[in-house]
Amino acid sequence: MHSSGSSFAKAGHEPGPPLWLLAELTYRCPLQCPYCSNPLDFAKQGAELSTAEWIEVFRQARELGAAQLGFSGGEPLVRQDLAELIAAARGLGYYTNLITSGIGLTEARIAEFADAGLDHIQISFQAADEEVNNLLAGSKKAFAQKLAMARAVKAHGYPMVLNFVTHRHNIDNIERIIELCLELEADFVELATCQFYGWAELNRAGLLPTRAQLERAERITNQWRDKLAAENHPCKLIFVTPDYYEERPKACMNGWGNLFLDITPDGTALPCHSARQLPVQFPNVREHSVEHIWRHSFGFNRFRGDDWMPEPCRSCDEKHKDFGGCRCQAFMLTGDASNADPVCSKSAHHEVILAARRQADEAPLGLGELQYRNDKASRIICKA
């Protein structure tokens, strides 16, 4: 890792520190969720960073001011050096969290991670129904393993943090999802409707809930919030909606290259999880220092500030609130990452969003029609 290379830093747009570092340790995963955010072509990605290379990334990012480090994937548990990486991150002063499906987790590994200094474990579920969960995961044993490991995480003194990715095929069971979380003594529950990137975008026609489904689910969630608050119950419910039913875009990542730094398994550095699909050459930690990447690389400066914005964003009085929306969504839905996010009603491409809403109401795909995330499918997509 070195610092050589041209500087594309923009005067007046000096970034702060990359406070949140995400280490996507691997794209390997025993599950095949059809809403995975990993790139469609994950099967052709390069060799994973070694233990030593990851630790050097952690060190350099910490020097820049990174404070929180997430271990993600794929499934990070397939990395046999995970405890060593956790210990190194802890020694550098990071707050660390493990984002996992729970597949591959054991009580022994939980204890090992605790000894290494891991602060937080989040376990994801596909559904509260065993059959649907296992179908979406592609494993007949997934649901039972998740239940066992959720209980084990709690027993080892960790806060119980659960994530349910919701979509049109499970969101109507939101009440049962919440009940299951309470049975597991969850402290925090993220009820996160699919965000349509990667495999989720490929399967959007089969995953996007209708507006009526979302409104019902949010209403039930709010009723449970009121009930839990009245009982002084510690469980917190977080409801995340897709922006497909909004008229203004989200402030994606709180601005491009502003707070978030993602390092992919092969060392490519990204300003968000999905940016790899853009027609932008992003830097790699094997070739450049993290400091150079964050401050000077073309990829991280491409959409900083607002000088890149065309109309209607350039003259919009909301541009410093939403930063023009999501660059990846603009690229996926309009073919040009510089365009206004089509979620915005001011966008010339807003009809794409309206059409997706109509499709959710009129012609959705069934569970059996989804393209599941696996190595074979990725290789076929790579050849297409």
Curated annotation (Swiss-Prot):
GO terms for molecular function: 4 iron, 4 sulfur cluster binding; cyclase activity; iron ion binding; oxidoreductase activity; S-adenosyl-L-methionine binding. Keywords: 4Fe-4S, Iron, Iron-sulfur, Metal-binding, Oxidoreductase, PQQ biosynthesis, S-adenosyl-L-methionine. [4Fe-4S] cluster binds at residues 29, 33, 36. It comes from the Bacteria. It is an enzyme of class 1 (oxidoreductase). Pathway: Cofactor biosynthesis; pyrroloquinoline quinone biosynthesis. CDD domains: Radical_SAM, SPASM_PqqE. It holds the Pfam family Radical_SAM. It catalyses: [PQQ precursor protein] + S-adenosyl-L-methionine = E-Y cross-linked-[PQQ precursor protein] + 5'-deoxyadenosine + L-methionine + H(+). Its EC number is 1.21.98.4. One of its GO terms (biological process) is pyrroloquinoline quinone biosynthetic process. Its cofactor is [4Fe-4S] cluster. Binds 1 [4Fe-4S] cluster. The cluster is coordinated with 3 cysteines and an exchangeable S-adenosyl-L-methionine. Belongs to the radical SAM superfamily. PqqE family. Catalyzes the cross-linking of a glutamate residue and a tyrosine residue in the PqqA protein as part of the biosynthesis of pyrroloquinoline quinone (PQQ). NCBIfam families: PQQ_syn_pqqE, rSAM_more_4Fe4S. Interacts with PqqD. The interaction is necessary for activity of PqqE. This is PqqA peptide cyclase.
